[in-house]
């Protein structure tokens, strides 16, 4: 019997649960669900700890983690995925990513449409037959979604009601549904990759005919990050692997990477400042392998950080002689607001302080 931590933040629900899994059946030992689309950061870890306490288990007794990887809004989705990756790394246990719609659909019977809120008057959707996905996932206006042969609709009640079909449960991904949605427990899990659907970054971009995929930075990437860091910022106190480890473990942070095949070729990170809204943000770093510069990778990485910050104001520092980076930041609304002399102590280089106003 395996003890699995299941978490999901792809919807308005902040879900954490402890599930016993015998290879066939799932038994929910404890679960905590808070429905608040603006409280993913604040509620996820407390929900995990309370679920563990309710199950009378210690963190060290977990055998695996399962996390919903979307589709879902950027900000909430990253919280769950980063937290799952941090638990897996700290405990030395596998982390399985699943489609959050599957965690709902797998608990349904017959032909069922599953929909969740995609914002912008759209829904994420997929169709299921006896718990197996037969169409989707996709995103679109409710009027453009074809229910097909669905006889019932599950998921967000507000959006499910738009389809004129009988409503059924679940409303949100459940811990047992997340565990049941893992396709093959005998296979080592692949790195977590967020499923956005709407943004171009959900699709591979190419560089010299090599597919480059933007995805979550994981603890398995820290050595490669440190290697690249020493190349990019030689003379400016490059971060060691331990520094990246610490940043990835902080649920207030969002770190993303650009990969070609199995090689990390770029990364970027941002942190949320403060504990109460309105929040502000600070870009920690953006770096792209010189061999892949000039192909839009840095702009894609920056776009992920801007999505994480949403409408909040964003700050960053940049070397005064890095004209390419300055031009990129200006193109998305950053303006110079100050100068920090000798900001980089090792090289003595100055930095501009830049700000993007709240949107």
Curated annotation (Swiss-Prot):
A molecular function (GO) term: protein-N-terminal-alanine acetyltransferase activity
N-terminal signal peptide: 1-15
Pfam families hit by this protein: Acetyltransf_1 (PF00583), TsaD (PF00814)
Name of the molecule in the record: Uncharacterized protein ML0378
GO biological process, one term: tRNA threonylcarbamoyladenosine modification
Cross-referenced SUPFAM superfamilies: Actin-like ATPase domain, Acyl-CoA N-acyltransferases (Nat)
Coiled-coil region: none
Residues that span the membrane, as ranges: none
Tagged with keyword Zinc: no
Record-annotated N-acetyltransferase domain positions: 212-359
Record keywords, A-Z: Signal
Disulfide bond recorded as keyword: no
């Amino acid at each position: 019997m395996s003890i699995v931590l299941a978490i999901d933040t792809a919807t308005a629900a902040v879900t954490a649960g402890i599930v016993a899994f015998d290879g066939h059946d799932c038994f929910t030992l404890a679960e905590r669900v808070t429905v608040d689309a603006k409280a993913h950061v604040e509620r996820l870890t407390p929900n995990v700890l309370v679920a563990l306490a309710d199950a009378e288990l210690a963190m060290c007794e977990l055998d695996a983690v399962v996390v919903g990887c979307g589709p879902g809004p950027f900000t909430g989705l990253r919280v769950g995925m980063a937290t799952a990756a941090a638990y897996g790394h700290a405990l030395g246990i596998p982390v399985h990513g699943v489609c959050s719609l599957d965690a709902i659909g797998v608990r349904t019977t017959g032909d069922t449409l599953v929909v969740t809120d995609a914002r912008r008057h759209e829904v994420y959707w997929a169709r299921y037959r006896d718990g197996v996905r037969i169409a989707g996932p996709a995103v679109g206006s409710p009027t453009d979604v074809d229910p097909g042969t669905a006889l019932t609709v599950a998921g967000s009640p507000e959006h499910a009601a738009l389809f004129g079909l009988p409503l059924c449960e679940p409303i949100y991904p459940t811990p047992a549904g997340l565990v049941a949605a893992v396709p093959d427990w005998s296979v080592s899990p692949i790195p977590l990759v967020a499923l956005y659907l709407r943004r171009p970054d959900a699709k591979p971009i190419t560089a010299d005919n090599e597919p480059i995929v933007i995805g979550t930075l994981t603890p398995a990437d820290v050595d490669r990050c440190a290697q690249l860091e020493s190349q990019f910022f030689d003379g400016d106190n490059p971060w060691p692997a331990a520094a990246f480890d610490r940043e990835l473990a902080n649920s207030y942070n969002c770190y993303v990477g650009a990969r070609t095949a199995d090689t990390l070729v770029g990364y970027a990170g941002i942190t949320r400042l403060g504990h109460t809204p309105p929040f502000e943000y600070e870009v920690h770093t953006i770096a792209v392998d010189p061999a892949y510069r000039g192909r839009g990778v840095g702009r894609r990485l920056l776009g992920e950080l801007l999505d994480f910050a949403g409408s909040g104001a964003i700050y960053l520092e940049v070397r005064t002689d890095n004209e390419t980076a300055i031009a990129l930041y200006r193109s998305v609304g950053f303006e110079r607001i100050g100068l920090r002399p000798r900001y980089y102590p090792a090289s003595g280089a100055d930095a501009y302080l830049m700000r993007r106003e709240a949107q």
